[in-house]
Amino acid sequence: MSRDVSAAATFYRELLGFETTFESDWYVSLRLGAFEVAVLAHDHATIPEGYRALPKGVIVNLEVDDVDAVHRSLAADPDTEIVMGLRDEDFGQRHFILAAPDGVLLDVIQPLPPSAEYADAYASA
């Protein structure tokens, strides 16, 4: 949910390359590959009254093929706020986190083989 649907949609389109699949003044649906995200006005009538406050503590994961290239591109943009730099995790990710509109955190991830400590935690395909 967003207090400024247009600005949030612009963030995802311009910084990350999402394409618009539906757009109105209170709702925008955006797609990047197989990933789709919707931005909805927090105060719209379709949201039950007790749930119209903007959520806090939301992190959205976005899996990419080349996290280093995405990081380079976004780090070069002075309007991008990277809140956690690029790093590898033993649990099987190379990632960084940036601030998105409305207090959302966007975790941009490229999967890596996990360490032996975490390998058994993954479900087999």
List the model feature ranges, each with a label.
Residues 2-5, 90:
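Conserved beta-strand-loop-alpha-helix junction that forms the acyl-donor binding cleft
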Residues 4, 66, 100:
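Acidic di-acidic motifs
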Residues 19-62, 71-99, 110-125:
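Vicinal oxygen chelate
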Residues 104-109:
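Structured catalytic cores of enzymes that bind and process phosphorylated ligands/cofactors
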Residues 7, 67-71:
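Short, conserved charged micro-motifs
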Residues 8-13, 74, 103:
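Conserved active-site tyrosine of GNAT-family acetyltransferases
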